[in-house]
Amino acid sequence: MSREIALTEPLYQAKGIKKYFPVTGGVLRRKIGEVKALDGVDLDIYRGETISVIGESGCGKTTLGRMLAVLQKPTGGELSFDFGDGLKNVVGLNRTEELAFRRRVQMIFQDPYTSFNPRQRVGAAIDEVLQVHGMKDPEERFSRIKESCEMVNMRVEYLQRYPHEFSGGQRQRLAIARCLAIKPELIIADEIVSALDVSIQAQIINLLRQIQRETGLSFVFITHDVAVARYVGHRIAVMYLGSVVEILPAGALPQNAEHPYTIALLSAVPDMNLQGKKKEIVLQGEVPSPIDAPSGCAFSTRCPYVMDICKIARPVLRLAYDTDPSHQVACHLEKPPIGA
């Protein structure tokens, strides 16, 4: 289901984000290389929008989420958030500024069980977050907790239970409630429905959309499921080997996809309406190692349309050929390839 969102001034902006992890070897464990988990990611996130991030396993989706939440510091590039008076770099904030940032930006993880203390009642876990962020009045905290639980359709009496007493879907609702309790502006959701049954997935996704309508929250929704990404997102960012290769409106999939990787990725998604007519594009070769990524375009070793320039110069995100200002593609092709 496509929805439109006003793309004005970004709430959060990532420019040229890199994250390299050192590879060590030998007796002295000296650095012998680097894993380029993220290699120059540009991404704008707007108020009230959901941007879905998709790609194969190992493409850097989760690392990007952790960078945006500043759970890890980038090797290079800038992360800038609008605190109300314009964009400000969020790397290297002091303690007070960091708390102000974390009040505004929260992250939900794939496994909610590991994000709760198994020996702590869930009500106490949510209350602890409010105390950390300076809410001292117990009655005010309880009112806020009650409100957030009601938003995710969980009874207040459940707060006296322990994490193991809930189903996976209920724990994920409580993880969402914990984020909502401090009234953030942006929530980063990392594969939060991938471990749930399909029926429960639909409930959680519809819940997020309802919360967004009621609060105007922004979401970064990280997933490997293209269908889920299309349904929940206003825009979709496609990642390959640590880079964003295409950003396009969710309603533009699959017909307006331009990057060869995006087209190949979409061709592998079953479509009952095109059964027998749809041709799957099988990419040759394996995904290159992030330790020894190819020069030029990261997709050049597997792209069926590769040119000489692709092996030399790395393409940057530019306006796509459909001239939609919200559609960007990183590709040297002079015209988009014909999709499957």
Go through the PLM ranges and name each one.
Residues Y162-F166, Q170:
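Conserved ABC ATPase signature
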Residues E78-A100, D137, L253:
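ABC ATPase NBD Q-loop/coupling interface
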Residues I192, L196, I200-K278:
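P-loop NTP-binding/switch modules centered on Walker-like glycine-rich loops
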Residues A69:
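Helix-to-loop junction immediately C-terminal to a conserved catalytic motif
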Residues D82-G86, E139-E157, L266:
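Conserved ABC ATPase "signature" region
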Residues A181-E185:
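A short, proline-enriched helix->beta-strand linker immediately N-terminal to the Walker B motif
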Residues E4-P10, T24, L28-R29, L87, ...:
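Charged, flexible cofactor/metal-binding loops and thiol motifs
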